[in-house]
Amino acid sequence: MQCALYDAGRCRSCQWITQPIPEQLSAKTADLKNLLADFPVEEWCAPVSGPEQGFRNKAKMVVSGSVEKPLLGMLHRDGTPEDLCDCPLYPASFAPVFAALKPFIARAGLTPYNVARKRGELKYILLTESQSDGGMMLRFVLRSETKLAQLRKALPWLQEQLPQLKVITVNIQPVHMAIMEGETEIYLTEQQALAERFNDVPLWIRPQSFFQTNPAVASQLYATARDWVRQLPVKHMWDLFCGVGGFGLHCATPDMQLTGIEIAPEAIACAKQSAAELGLTRLQFQALDSTQFATAQGEVPELVLVNPPRRGIGKPLCDYLSTMAPRFIIYSSCNAQTMAKDIRELPGFRIERVQLFDMFPHTAHYEVLTLLVKQ
C-alpha cells in the first residue's frame, strides 16, 4: 500500500506498511504458532485476509488547529497536530465528509480543544460507515454543552451537504485526559442506530457499542464461527462478551437456546433488535458482566463462545469453565498473548482448530479464532 503520509514521515501508525501482505501474514502466523507452541493443535486453517487499503469503516479524528482552519487527524507525542484526512485506510466515501466538516466546524463555532492550554470545545470527530447501505454515523465529542445550541442551529446545512449522515450525536467528555468518549450521549437525529448487514444477518451500530473496524474480514470471521458451530452437536450456547451480538446471531438456529452477555447496555439493545428482526425467539441478550453471569449459573451449555477485550477472559472465568467443563469453547481473540495465557488455565481442553484473521493489516495485530474441545 502506498501512503504519502508514511513516505513523508508524517505518520508511523502502519509500522509494517513496507512489507507485502503475504510477508505480513507469514510473520503473524509465526507469532501465533510461537505463542501456542506448548499446545498440540489438531488443525491449522489458512489465514484469512481482506483488502489492504480503504477497508476501515471508522475514523477517530483528533480535532486541532483553529476554528477557521481545523485539522482532523492525530497529535504527535510532542503535541504537534497531523491532518490524516488522506489516510489510505479510509474508503473514498470519507473524503467528502471530512471536506464538509471543516467549514462546518467554522460555521458552528466549534473551537478545537487545545490540550496544552486546556481550552476549546471540540475534542474528536468519530465517523462510522455502514457497508450495507452507505449510511453514516457522526459523533462530535465536546468538552461541555456550551456550544450545543450553536451546533444544533448549524446542523441543517451539514445534513443538506451530507444526506448519508443517518445518525448524528454529541458526546460530552469533560475530563482533561486522552479518553475518546464520555458517558453522556445527546442525539441530534431521530435515528439512533446505524443499520449494518453481514452475511444476511442484520446488525446495528449504536454510538457507544463496540463494532469491528474491518467489515470485510469481520464478516468472514463471523461466517467461520457459524460454520464451526454448525458442525458441532450444540443445542444450547452462551455468547460471552457478545457486543452487538455478531457471533451469536450468526451461530444461532431457530431451535437453539442462546444467551448473549455484554456489560454495555447500548450493545445489548442492538443485539435484541437484530434477534427480533430474525425472528429468533430462543435468544436472550442481557447487559451483565460476563464473568459474574457465568459463575452464577448452575446449568452449563454445550458450547461457550467468548470474545473478550484485549485483557482476555481472566483466571476466575477460566477456573469456572475448567470446573463446569462445557463440551466446546470457541475463543475469538484480538490478543493472542492473553488467549494463550487463558488456554494454559484450561488444562482439561485440547485445541482442535485455529485460524488467523488479518483484521489489522500493516500492523503486528491480528484476530484469531480457536476451537477448544473437552478432553
Swiss-Prot record:
Catalysed reactions listed for this entry: uridine(747) in 23S rRNA + S-adenosyl-L-methionine = 5-methyluridine(747) in 23S rRNA + S-adenosyl-L-homocysteine + H(+)
Keyword Magnesium: no
CDD domains: AdoMet_MTases
GO molecular function, one term: 4 iron, 4 sulfur cluster binding
Biological process terms in GO annotation: rRNA base methylation
This protein's record includes keyword Ubl conjugation: no
Sites where the protein binds S-adenosyl-L-methionine: 212, 241, 262, 307
Residues the record marks as active site: 334 (nucleophile)
Family: Belongs to the class I-like SAM-binding methyltransferase superfamily. RNA M5U methyltransferase family. RlmC subfamily.
Known function: Catalyzes the formation of 5-methyl-uridine at position 747 (m5U747) in 23S rRNA.
Name of the protein in its database record: 23S rRNA (uracil(747)-C(5))-methyltransferase RlmC
Originating organism: Shigella boydii serotype 4 (strain Sb227)
Gene: rlmC
